[in-house]
Amino acid sequence: MPAIITKDFRIHNARQFQESFSEAADTYYLAIGRPQAFADNQAFNDGTDTSPPTPVDDVGQVEYYAYDDLLSAKKIASSDTTLVIPRRDWATGTTYDYYRHDYGDINTAGATITSNSNATNLYDSTFYVVNSSYDVFVCIDNDGDTASTTEPTTKQAAIFSTADGYKWKYMYSLASAEQANFLSTDFMHVSTESTDYSTVGGAIENVKVTAGGASGTNGSYTSVVIRGDGTGGRCTVVVGANAVSSVTITTAGTGYTFASVLASDIGSVVGADIDFIISPPGGHATDVVAELGGFYVMTNTNFTQTESGEFNTDNDFRRVVLIRNPIDSDSAATATESTLDCTKSIVFSGSPGTFVADEKITQSSSGAVGYVIDYTSGTKTLRYIQPQFANQGIDSNGTLTAFTGTDTVTGATSSATGTPTTHDTTPELQHDSGDILYIENRKPVTRASDQTENVKLIVEF
C-alpha cells in the first residue's frame, strides 16, 4: 500500500523533541568517548581515524558497547537547543528555485513538476536564502530561471523585487546569539515566531505559464477573475500570436487551495496551461518552521576546559553520544548533575610512577586489564576504561575483570607501578542506563587544558 510520512508529522516530531529538553520528565546528556584509535583491529567495520566507521544500530552497539569507552557527559539545557534548517547562503550568479506549493505533483502533460534544481519536493529545492547580514528570504519568483545577481536586503512585510528581476519575501533575521550558538556550516536557526501578521492564507503571489495554447484572440485582458475556492484574485493575461504570452497577478486574493481562469475570459485560448502558485496556510512568514521545513533539531554544547575536573584534557575523543535519562550511580536515580564522569578510577598510595594516557594497565593478581585515560599526580588518581577488547579491557581469558585490592598495577608503556588504596569501578554515569538516541563517529578531536570544544549535533526527523 503506497504511503508517506508527511512533512507535518516530521515537523511535529522535531518540535516535540525540542520541547522535551525543557520538560521535567526527561534529561539529556551529550557524552564524548572513544579515546582509542579506530584502527585497532578489534572488530569488523572498524574504520580508521581518517575514515571513521558508520555506527551500527543494533542491540550490542547501542545498548551495551557504546558505554564502554565513554569519558564524560554534560547535561544539555533547553536553551542549548533549537529547530534548524539547511543553511543556504545567497551567492551572486546562482539560479535559485522559487516557492511552489505543488512540487512533485503531476501536471496536465503527465510530467512531474520539478524545480529548476530538479527537486521534486519543496524542501529539497533552493527556494530560500540567508544574506550576508543573516536575514532570511523566500524566493517568490526567479525571473524565468535566471541567475540572481542582486542580494535581497529589504526587511519589509510586502513582497519586493530586486534589480535582477527576482521577487523575495522577508522571513526573519538571526540575532547575534543565534548566529553564535545555532549557525554552522550546513545548518541555521529557524524562527518559531511569525514575522508577518499581515499576510493571509491562500493568496496567489506567483503564476507560471507552462503552455500558451492556441487559437485565442490577441489582446490584453485585465481584471480577469481567478476562479477556485478562494476569493478576490485578479490577474492580467496577455494573448499574443493567438497564445497566452504572460500572466500578471494584480490582486492576490485569499483562501485559495486551487485556482484557474476561464478560457472565455482570456480570448478563448485553447489548450493553455496556467499554474497559479498558492501561498502556504496562513500566508508566507506566518509559520516559518513549517514553510521552510524545520524538521531538524540542533543541540549546541560547549566543553569548557576540564568542566571542574569531570572532563579530561590529556586525551582525544572520536565519538559523541546523545543519551536520554541516564542513571546517576551515586543517587541511583535519573541523572540531573551538570556533568558526569563516565570512567573508572584507582587512587594509589606512596609514590607511584607516572602513568601515561592510552597505555594498557594490568594487575597481575586479578588479571584485570584497563586503558588509561589520564593520571593526576597530585591526587595520585588514575582514570581508565575497560572496553570489551583485548589489551584494553579484556584479560587473557577473554573476561572483563575488575581491578581490586592492593596488588600492584603496572603500566605497559610507562612501566609505572602503583599500589592501590581505593577503587571506584562504578562510573557516575551508570553504564547501560538510559536511551542512546544518537551516535556519531568523528575524526580525533584533541583537547587542551585551555581549550573549549563546541559540539553541534543535528537530529533529522
Mark where each language-model region is:
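Extended assembly-interface regions of large multimeric machines
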Residues: M1-A147, K155-T192, G309-S345, G353, ...
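Conserved, function-critical positions that sit in or immediately flank catalytic
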Residues: S161-F461
